[in-house]
Amino acid sequence: MEWFWYIIAALGAGVGTGLVGLSAATVMVPMLIVLCPSFTGETGAYQATAVALASDILGSAVATYTYAKHKNIDLKRGWLIMAIILIMSAIGSYAAFLTGNVVLGGFTLILTVCIGIRFLVKPDSAKKNPVKNGTKLGLKEVILSFACGIPIGFGTGFVGSGGGMTMLIVLSAFFGMELKTAVGTSTFIMTFTALIASASHIMIHPAIFFEKWDVMLLCIVVATTASLVSARFANRVNNRTVGLVTGVVLTVLGIAMIILNYWVM
């Protein structure tokens, strides 16, 4: 029965990543901890986070390729926050190992539901005067890169989740990127963030790879496939459709994860 939940968790994670750049751990970690007995125990959450981060690498990579092919990515304004997030994610991974069993924070889950409702109410997030792709970083963006990149990076390494969702908010609301561009840039950053954080988790606790390599391989394949399909869908439809689907996905996933975290547990 556990293998069924592995597939469901990876499928949900892949759809979330390809559609809105959602961190795989936001979906996978609570499901693995609550529904899969093999992820219980002192290092259960740490192992679940490592599996989710590993699933995020190729899932984010194929999504990034799809968004980049449609020119929905902006690296000139995203490089600085990316560098900061990468450094802090490695630090967060080490801190997570020192603190032991950490369960996904409730704030991220509530935030996911709120953002989902926001997209349902206002699905078309396109601005009248969006910032053009390739515009150089201004002082405001530099300050925001440090102010937002430090907590996002540390949080991604620490609990493996929240990075994609919070990056989407920062890039769209504060950097002025259009929704698809924000998602494409976010998944690009998450590709390397997940790689650094996953490698850090495994190097700090090598037993994860030897004990969970089969689970990790299955989740990577399922999440990557789901991410590719959902990313292609997102880039072929208009912003309103993406917004509506995003709203439904985030609201349903957020409510489901809250139930798993607080009612089931």
Residue ranges and their predicted role:
Residues 230-251:
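Interfacial loop-to-transmembrane junctions
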Residues 59-70, 109-134, 231-232, 254-265:
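Transmembrane helix exit motif
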Residues 3-85, 89, 93, 146-153, ...:
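Small-residue-rich hydrophobic segments that form or flank transmembrane alpha-helices
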Residues 46, 76, 102-105, 180, ...:
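Residues that define the loop-to-transmembrane-helix transition and helix capping
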Residues 3, 53, 108-112, 116, ...:
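Residues within membrane-spanning alpha-helices of integral membrane proteins
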Residues 135-151:
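Membrane-water interface at loop-to-transmembrane-helix junctions
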Residues 98-111, 124, 241-244, 263:
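Loop-to-transmembrane alpha-helix entry segments
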